[in-house]
Amino acid sequence: MKRNFLNYKLLTGIALSMGLMTACSSDDSTNEDPTDPEVPAVDSRWITVAGAKMGTNPGDGNGGTYIYSINSEDAKDPTVSIDPFENGFIAPSNRTARLQSSEDGSTIFNISYAGDTGGNYTKYDVQGGNTFQQLGTDVNISQYVGTAPRWVKLFDGDQTGAAVYVNVAEPTIDDNGTPDDISDDTYVRTDATIGVVTLDLENSLIKNFEEHSVPLSAEEEANGYYFSRIDMPTLNAAGDKLYIGGRLSKVDPTTTESDSDYTILGSKTIVLDYPSLLNPTVITSAVGHGNTNGYRSINAFEYNGSVYQANQSDPEGSHILKIDANNQYDDSYDFNLDDALNVNGAYILAWRPASNGKAVVAYRHDDSVEGVAGAQGFFALVDLNAKTAQKIDAIPYDPDFYLFQYQGFVVDGTEIYLTQGAVGENGNIYIVETETGEVTKGAELVNIEGSHFIGVF
């Protein structure tokens, strides 16, 4: 029997006051028993499923983001079936919304991406099903970081979000005092100006904004390197530094044209004082190479006093890097996913650790088959302390299982919730008990043509 969910506006005030969070109907019963044992326990939490609808091409996610919430007991029940695309709430965004949630799942935060409403921040009280009640007023941050801001919440008790952008200038050229003679011109550097805004998530207010020109070393700049993209701000354990991941690009100093055939440098992170957002410095890993800006999902997390950060486009396969309390990379910590998973070209697409230092990682690798939207994705269970990783074989992997746009995991104690489903195919919620590796197949997720699920919140 599949149980199909109705609108959660049917919840009574009494049920809400008791923290009981379910309202569903059964296919073979029209009379609801008020003592139904399926009523969840008082320690239940909301699990919000997000789906990205196809725009033009399968898996592009440009047709809008749909969200739908159920309680954690029903999320674990494979007889439950939900249809976010048919019954869900449309999260405001011109393209795929970039969502965040409170730690307890009771609030969804959204900043619209691109279009006329790009940069508009809204938050919603999660009330079950497709009922998301807007809280407070909108605030628009586009005047600070543009209409396509890259933002995440900071792990400070759901108080603050941070959004960033980078503006790359035209290459600086020294004309040697002869502006009409280009034969003696010398390339100097390409300036990248970053902007960072912090947002009061509780009161929908701008907290701070700063811009900086962030230099690399003189040698790196002379060779044409510059920050071309930044993302994924993360607080250190002390709460006095903000780490921002970055991607480097390069121009050919002899022509100032874009150079795609270059040596990939050690992974870099921009460090700012917090909350002032002043005094930018750059730190460099001697272990990992490539980018640290991630894509759609939070890319760095504080655990046990240090920040653990994934990198991407590493010639040796993705690493999980460690930044210690001294705000420098710990180059004695070497955790390489190629080695741990026995694959080539591992690429971390998204990940999330539990409080025990064990995490679920979404990844692809060089031998991933090419699906309808891109390379096939997988999930692995990793241990940050032991530096081990194991593919989670209990989750099915269709060739069209596409995780490049994956955003959300829910951590509930030592359990991590995730979504599975190939592009255009039905899937399920899965729950990984990180202590034991046990995997539970949960609620069915009904899909539509060309669309895919991008996580839970």
Identify the role of each PLM range.
Residues 1-48:
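Bacterial Sec-dependent N-terminal signal peptides
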Residues 52-61, 165-192, 240-266, 312-314, ...:
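Short, conserved, GDST-rich strand-edge loop motifs in beta-rich repeat architectures
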Residues 59-184:
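Post-signal peptide N-terminal segment of secreted/secretory-pathway proteins
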Residues 63-73, 121-128, 181-205, 257-277, ...:
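Beta-propeller blade signature
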Residues 76-89, 130-144, 193, 198-222, ...:
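Beta-propeller fold detector
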Residues 88-101, 141-157, 221-234, 289-302, ...:
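Repeated scaffold domains used in trafficking and secretory/extracellular systems
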Residues 208-372:
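Acidic, serine/threonine- and glycine-rich low-complexity intrinsically disordered segments
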Residues 346-422:
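Loop/turn-rich, solvent-exposed surfaces of beta-rich toroidal or solenoidal domains
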